[in-house]
Structure formats: C-alpha cells, structure tokens
UniProtKB/Swiss-Prot annotation:
Descriptive protein name: Gamma-aminobutyraldehyde dehydrogenase
Transmembrane segments: none
Pfam families: Aldedh
Note: 4-aminobutanal can spontaneously cyclize to 1-pyrroline, and 5-aminopentanal to 1-piperideine.
Superkingdom per UniProt: Bacteria
Catalytic residues of the enzyme: E246, C280
Catalysis performed (reactions): 4-aminobutanal + NAD(+) + H2O = 4-aminobutanoate + NADH + 2 H(+); 5-aminopentanal + NAD(+) + H2O = 5-aminopentanoate + NADH + 2 H(+)
CDD domains, per database record: ALDH_ABALDH-YdcW (cd07092)
Pathway: Amine and polyamine degradation; putrescine degradation; 4-aminobutanoate from 4-aminobutanal: step 1/1; Amino-acid degradation
Database matches in NCBIfam families: ABALDH, PRK13473.1
Oxidoreductase keyword on record: yes
Residue ranges the record marks as coiled coil: none
Gene behind the chain: patD
N-terminal signal peptide: none
Annotated source species: Escherichia coli O17:K52:H18 (strain UMN026 / ExPEC)
Amino acid sequence: MQHKLLINGELVSGEGEKQPVYNPATGEVLLEIAEASAEQVDAAVRAADAAFAEWGQTTPKARAECLLKLADVIEENGQVFAELESRNCGKPLHSAFNDEIPAIVDVFRFFAGAARCLNGLAAGEYLEGHTSMIRRDPLGVVASIAPWNYPLMMAAWKLAPALAAGNCVVLKPSEITPLTALKLAELAKDIFPAGVINVLFGRGKTVGDPLTGHPKVRMVSLTGSIATGEHIISHTAPSIKLTHMELGGKAPVIVFDDADIEAVVEGVRTFGYYNAGQDCTAACRIYAQKGIYDTLVEKLGAAVATLKSGAPDDESTELGPLSSLAHLDRVSKAVEEAKATGHIKVITGGEKRKGNGYYYAPTLLAGALQDDAIVQKEVFGPVVSVTLFDNEEQVVNWANDSQYGLASSVWTKDVGRAHRVSARLQYGCTWVNTHFMLVSEMPHGGQKLSGYGKDMSLYGLEDYTVVRHVMVKH
C-alpha cells in the first residue's frame, strides 16, 4: 500500500511519529505510517506557494486537461481505489466501486469543464476616461482537510474546485482513513506540475495545526466536526485566512399524512443507513405526522431489521462497520442515553454487534421528543429517531430548532405544501419526496453551525477565487 507523502512532486516518507491505520471490519492494524514533520509541512506549503506563480497563470484549458487526466486514471484504477477504501473504511466493496468511484470521477470532470466557464463580469466606463473590469482570480495556497467518512470523495470535492480555479493545494486526509488520498497522490504527481498538489499524513495537532496556521496558506477548507471547525477558525483568526467550512448535520425528514409511506420507508432504509449512517446528510431525524406515525414506525422498523451487516467484501452486505473503536463507543453511548429517557422505544437494533470489528446494529428509535439529545445532536451512525408532530407550523418550527443547517427533506403529495415548507426550512438543501441525492452541478453546503461555503457546482468554484477590480485609465 502506498504510504508516502507527496511534497513538491516527490513521494517521501514521513519524518514524524508513526501512527497505526486500522481495518475497522476486523480491528486489525493494516500498517503504520509516519506523520509529516513540522519541516515537511513547511516544505509542502512553500512548494505550493512556489508552484502557484506559474500554475495560477495557466489557462483554464490547461488546468482542465490535467483534471481530465486525473479523472481518467482514477477511473482506470477504480477497483484499486475501491478496495483501499473498503479495507480502510469498512465500506461494502460494491458500494465503494459502484456508487462512489463514478461520482468521484464525475466531480473532476465537472470541474474540468467549469474551469473553462469561470469569468468575471464584463464591465464598462463608470468614471470618464477609465474602463473597469472584474476578475475572479485564484487565491494561492489552499490547505484542505478531508474527513474519514468519505476519504476519496471529499479529497475530490476539495481538490477539484481549488485546482480548477488555479490554486495550489496541500491536502491532509484524516489520519484514520488516509490510504486512498495517498494513492491519489501517487497518480497525481505524474499529471500536475511539482508543488501544485501536496498530500500530507498526520494528526490535527501535529500536522493540521502547523498547516492551517502557516503564513503562506491563504485559505483553509474543512469538512469535519463542529469542534474541529471552531478550532480551525480560532487557530487561523490571527492571520485572517479565508475559511470554507462543512461541519456536519442532523437532517430533518418531514413526513406528512399524505406522503407515500412505501417510498418513505424505502428512502429512509437507504438514505438513513448508507455508509453505516456516517454521513452528514443522513436521513436520521424523522418527524411523522400523527395520522401516519404508527404505520410508519411499524413498516420502517420491519424494513430496517432486514438491513444486512457483514464483511465489506460480501456482495450481500449493506452496512459495514463504523470507522473506529472510539466512534463505535460514541454511537453506543448516544443510544444508551436515549434508552435511559424511558419514553424512547427501541424498535430494532440498539446494540453493538458481537464479534470482531466496529459494528453497530442498524437502529430505529420511536417516541423521541424535540428536546431529546438523540433529536438535537448528531450521532453519525446507523441510528434514526422518529418524532410525532401535529401540524405544519409545529414541524417547521421543530425542524428549524437545531444548531445544524445542512440538509432536509419533505415528503408529501401536496405540491403547494412542498413549496411552502421548503421555502421556510433553514437548510442548505431541501429534497422533496427523496433524500440524499447529489449531483456535481448543484451546490452542497450548510447554514448555522453546519458551516458556510459551497462544495460542487459553479458556486463551489467561485468560493476558491477572489473578486478583483481592475481599472484602466485611457
């Protein structure tokens, strides 16, 4: 397995402390990787800064060609990437290969095209004898921090728009799941000029802090927890860096009496438990109107009970393990606290799986109340709660009564209600009669403590640029 860092176009071994990388399906150590030293972090940033002088002036066509080549080699090595992702994350292999790899390839291809469509507003003479124009220029060095739930996908979301806009990047994947990012580094080094892409390995304190705090870094992009986001914003404040934050969510799923119950059940069975629920947009906080509450709980409980946990390389496996032992304990603690309320009922699941690996049973909890922690706090596991509501006004208020603001969905056959409720929800995305669906052309990003800035779409590309005014006297 490729375990070297990419710094200034060269694959090099880390010079810091070695850290174990685990297979969460077995609990076994896959390998140990040496972290980047402080000197290597500095070297990576300075390499990116030096490369920016030329890369930032390349044509959109040239940048697009590099991104398309990278997309092609990811596609050609799709099986290798899927197997690495499956071993390091515990994802079902068929899901990694069939769902994630094509989407990752598409992200790079989309931004290759988007790079050639980015422009500033054509302007004119707003002062006699002077012509103004607006430019959208790259920022410089971007420090990108990717999470452990979708390591390669999030690396793509970070790299593609930043590079398309003309920036240079230093990427730090999670120390828990670094393998696909390090493999990507191996392939990217032969496509991009030295220093344009750099990939480091290490923990937040030892590598993340010196990277994000480096004076040559102009922007920090993070997908991660609220706590990590708060830390980075505080840590980078003295140098006034631009920050781009996607910090998790607790998606409300509003099911009205007139909804297609079978579609809701099928949707939540898929969208609430995909990737073992380790998804910031997971359909995890259901609000069911009183007329269909009992029926929905019964049918959804039966459906969730059929979800198959198992070995990632088993074609029939639908749920793999959680990412780490520490995270398994966090999920288990959240469910135990819910049980202890006395009014929340476990419909199915509610316990760790016996045996090796970090498995938690797919869980459905009914009878949750608005102020319960299971409703208010992100669990980030295969755990879905159901809360009864009376009317539209109540459920909109409850849905918005959250520190999160990333994703939401509304299930109803009433088109007017769908538009009315969607307009009032304080979330970056609202789906109607579906959930979890993402496309490269549309923006993804949140409000409130879910963060700010957009991934994907032309909006995402613009986030990696600076608006500049140029005035010419004539």
